[in-house]
Regions:
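Non-transmembrane "mature" sequence context
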Residues: 1-129
Length: 129
């Protein structure tokens, strides 16, 4: 019911929340140099679904876990962007061991627990800046 009301309030031709989040996830992955296979692991969907996301033929569903993981992934990107900028520094941070996290963030985010831990770590770091 709320989804219908939300869609009725949007101007004609405006993208829905699913399309917006899907594009944000794909753009964040592109900026961070993260492969479709890793994005699939993060979202808990198939690599084929991520490929369809990239081509605009699949949209994240706000009634499924993939939605929550997508929101966390975009949050991760926004935190990295605020702390390091979206460039080589963010990619290096993801790829290198982090003593506080106990591993490489890029590997950790492939699991639910790891994604949440990395996002919380970045939120705490961002809060100090």
């Amino acid at each position: 019911m709320q989804t219908k009301q939300l869609r009725q309030q949007l101007p004609a031709g405006a993208p829905d929340a699913g399309t917006t989040l899907t594009k944000a996830v794909m753009r964040a992955a592109s900026f961070l140099g993260i492969s479709q296979a890793v994005v699939a692991s993060v979202l808990g969907i198939s690599t084929a679904s991520v490929s369809r996301m990239a081509s605009g033929h699949y949209v994240l569903d706000n009634h499924r876990k993939e939605w929550e993981f997508g929101v966390l992934f975009v949050r991760l990107f926004r935190s990295l962007d605020a702390i390091l900028g979206h460039g080589d520094q963010a990619r290096l941070w993801l790829a290198n061991d982090n003593l506080a996290l106990g591993g490489k963030p890029l590997e950790l985010i492939r699991t639910t627990e790891g994604l949440v831990r990395v996002v919380h770590y970045l939120d705490a770091t961002r809060g100090r800046i």
